[in-house]
From Swiss-Prot:
The lineage of its organism: Eukaryota, Viridiplantae, Streptophyta, Embryophyta, Tracheophyta. Heterotrimer of RPA1, RPA2 and RPA3 (canonical replication protein A complex). Interacts with RPA1C and RPA3. Residues 14-46 are annotated as: Disordered. This is Replication protein A 32 kDa subunit C. GO terms for molecular function: single-stranded DNA binding; telomeric DNA binding.
Length: 430
């Protein structure tokens, strides 16, 4: 039974194998003479059963095997791994029935393959009953013992009752193929697109320099203005090395200083921990616009000892002074210190409203006026909410505008209709 298990991944066994007899091999003429068993060879565990394959893949592998052997029984392999059993799925396009066998052609949309199923007992007759033109079947095929004839021996035939099995079969074919060729493809890639490498440079003391490249350095050799960025590390006399991160210095020198991208600068020092500076946004158009719309500039001032100042800017101060204080973004002020750690983090204070911040911050915003009217205590006390006419009276806006605003707020989930299309109530009841 161990020999039979190598031909099948399921429970479909040949009658001769169930009785314990060796599996027969058939010649191209169909005489039924048993061939001498070939010595066992070590194989990939993934190929111990039937390998899912397409007809196109089988045809290419068969042609390569015939060209390599030059005659006799070819050594069939899938992606370089020797195997003799494959599983194909397709539609039967032609059938020739005889007393001893049934020959049919299977088409899986990548090609056609001729197959034969020998009839020896009633179980074979049952399997051959599934072979009908236009029917989709799944076939386990043995490709040994046919000399130069391109014909496979159908070991097990099962009809397809769910079309999802067709999709699953092709997914399995792709999975097995990619698993087999993945390592080979990785070795064939040029060095410029291979995976990342890490460079470590020894230092005179302290912790070693650790350099990580997150993107491959492709097309290095172009003009410096379009090259990808390069991390630069400067040695120090002791302690921890300076850690510098560059987020792309593209087209440096091609434009005026106002539109050049930001450059992080780090200076060596005699001891302690180096300055850690991160710039999230480039300094674009600095000096071209008024100060109220200029982007943020990180400033670091050296000091006498301790840890350097750590400054993080999350958002640029855009349009400072143009809007009310509630919608202005924050400003940053950093001063040098004589020692210790000085870290100042300003979070954005935009649209600081008690509720409904997504409706905007203008004083006369129609949506805000309607929401404020619905938040009045006397309106909240009404069981069915406020009538549209009452909102018109309180806001002074036309009824058509009120209806449009209310529909928009209802779609956004801020208000809801109650007893009819004229009564509306706020989702926030105080």
């Amino acid at each position: 039974m161990a020999a039979a298990a190598s031909y099948f991944s399921g429970t479909a066994l040949m009658p001769s194998q169930r009785s314990g007899a060796p599996a027969p091999e058939y010649s191209a003429a169909g005489t039924g003479a048993a061939a001498a068993p070939s010595p066992s060879k070590p194989r990939d565990p993934r190929f111990s059963g039937c390998v899912p394959a397409t007809v196109l893949h089988i045809s290419r592998s068969f042609a390569a095997a015939l060209a390599a052997d030059g005659g006799g029984d070819p050594v069939f392999s899938i992606d370089g791994v020797e195997t003799t059993n494959v599983r194909v799925l397709g539609r039967v396009v032609s059938v020739v029935s005889r007393d001893t066998d049934v020959c049919f052609t299977l088409d899986d949309s990548t090609g056609k393959i001729p197959l034969v199923r020998w009839i020896t007992d009633q179980s074979d007759t049952r399997d051959t009953s599934y072979i009908q033109e236009g029917v989709y079947v799944k076939v386990q095929v043995n490709l040994m013992g046919f000399q130069a004839k391109k014909q496979g021996l159908a070991r097990s035939i099962r009809p397809i009752n769910n079309f999802n099995e067709v999709v699953l079969h092709f997914i399995e074919c792709m999975h097995v193929h990619l698993e087999s060729v993945q390592s080979k493809m990785q070795r064939q890639l040029p060095p410029s697109v291979q995976t990342n490498e890490y460079t470590h440079v020894p230092s005179s003391g302290g912790v070693r320099d650790y350099q990580v490249h997150f993107t491959p350095q492709v097309n290095q050799g172009l003009p410096p203005a379009v090259q990808t960025n390069t991390s630069t590390y400067v040695p120090l006399l002791g302690g921890v090395r300076d850690h510098q991160a560059h987020f792309a210095q593209v087209n440096q020198g091609q434009f005026s200083p106002a539109v050049q991208a930001n450059t992080s600068t780090h200076l060596p020092f005699s001891g302690g921990v180096g300055e850690h500076q991160i710039h999230f946004t480039p300094k674009v158009n600095q000096g071209q616009f008024p100060p109220s719309v200029q982007t943020n500039t990180s400033a670091h001032v050296p000091y006498s000892g301790g840890f350097r100042e750590h400054q993080v800017h999350f958002t640029p101060p855009v349009n400072q002074g143009q809007f009310p204080p509630a919608v202005q973004t924050n400003l940053y002020n950093h001063a040098a210190s004589s020692g210790g750690v000085r870290e100042q983090v300003h979070l954005t204070q935009a649209n600081q409203f008690s509720a409904y911040s997504s409706t905007g911050g203008l004083q006369h915003d129609p949506q805000r006026m309607v929401l404020e009217a619905l938040q009045q205590p006397d309106i909240l006390a009404l069981e069915h909410g406020a009538h549209v006419d009452e909102l018109v009276r309180r806001t002074g806006m036309p009824k058509a505008n009120i209806m449009g605003v209310v529909k928009h707020l209802a779609a956004a989930g801020f208000v809801y209709w109650t007893i009819d299309d004229n009564h509306v109530k706020s989702m926030c009841n105080g």
